[in-house]
Amino acid sequence: MSSDSANRDLAPLIALMETEALQRGEFTLASGKKANYYLDCRRVTLHPKGACLIGRAMLDVVLANAKESGVMPAAVGGMAIGADPITASIVTLAGGDDVDLKGFMVRKEPKGHGMGQQVEGPVTPGQKVVIVEDVITSGGSALKAVEAVQAFGLEVQYVLAIIDRLAGGAEAFAQKGLELKTLTTIRDFGLEP
């Protein structure tokens, strides 16, 4: 896993996440694991300031990676519904910056009518994409998105998340040959795995 927060001032995002998204108590996570805190990132991804902060930070990571690798992804997207506001924020800011970066979404199941697609958006097989996600625990949700877009014929460059709980997600992606890039980790909030 690489945390891409080193050269970026993420203090405003971290502060907003602490006040809006971080809850303490006993919780069962999507992975089935128990935790003494919960990060409801939708409270930040759907917040006007949060959407801007996340969209800008993630777009910066995508552009920096494209500059370093020489390969610009065609699109960003992830599993509905958690990744949808993240995708929208990134592509909106990309459009404002005149960057040709589209978005897509992955349905949990293929649509039962119409074209019956699981991957929706202006993408075509063979294109390179980045999977975006809010919180990574085991990586299960993002891995389902990876599998769906690969089945559609897209090539995943890496996974980009807001926060890594440091609970095995990076290792799960590495087993699939993918790198996990994150804006923050739980340690940025004074928490340990």
Curated annotation (Swiss-Prot):
Coiled coil: none annotated. Orotate binds at residues 137, 165. It is an enzyme of class 2 (transferase). Its cofactor is Mg(2+). Keywords: Glycosyltransferase, Magnesium, Pyrimidine biosynthesis, Transferase. CDD domains: PRTases_typeI. InterPro entries: OPRT, Or_phspho_trans_dom, PRibTrfase_dom, PRTase-like. One of its GO terms (biological process) is pyrimidine nucleobase biosynthetic process. It catalyses: orotidine 5'-phosphate + diphosphate = orotate + 5-phospho-alpha-D-ribose 1-diphosphate. The keyword Glycosyltransferase applies. Its EC number is 2.4.2.10. Belongs to the purine/pyrimidine phosphoribosyltransferase family. PyrE subfamily. Catalyzes the transfer of a ribosyl phosphate group from 5-phosphoribose 1-diphosphate to orotate, leading to the formation of orotidine monophosphate (OMP). Homodimer. This is Orotate phosphoribosyltransferase. It comes from Rhodopirellula baltica (strain DSM 10527 / NCIMB 13988 / SH1).
